[in-house]
Amino acid sequence: PRIVPFGDISLNPGALVFHYGAEVFEGLKAYRTPNGEVQMFRPAENFKRMNNSAERLCLPQFDVDDAVEYLRKFVEVEKDWVPDQYGTSLYLRPFLFGTDADLALHGISHATFMVIACVVGSYYKSGLAPVDMLIEMDDVRAVRGGTGYAKCGGNYAAATRAGEKAAKKGYSQVVYE
């Protein structure tokens, strides 16, 4: 493991992540306490869920304790980016993607684990105020036996159309029937 400056990455065009969506991710935050200490919210739980998602997509598993320790080191290096204004935090996006260069669909033996970060405020423009939600009747996000429980890019890509529809109608989010 190594911590390097943010930048582009180079991948073989045949990498499974491009052709079969072999990718999972998580999202968590580092924040400052009132006394200035930097903390993260439940990183081990996020990494356990990430491993569950990876298992569903046949991506390699990783050691949760090691991942938490690496993330702590990353946050320590980047601690100056953790804001101290109320309602703000450093958003951490760990992700794991299949890098096998093969057009055949199979379990993945080679993967890359990365973390990127950015400063964020509230997820919704309205902050902590209630939001209006569209009840989506046409598109579905998950089916029995599918990947709905996994945090994988395909689930979110498939939800984009409903999200755009909701935004055009003035809603902040979508609830699927």
Model-flagged regions — what are they?
Residues 1-74, 102-177:
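Helix-start/capping segments and mature chain N-termini
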Residues 80-85, 105-107:
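Short, charge-rich binding segments
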Residues 77, 98-99:
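Intrinsically disordered, low-complexity linker/loop segments enriched in Gly/Pro
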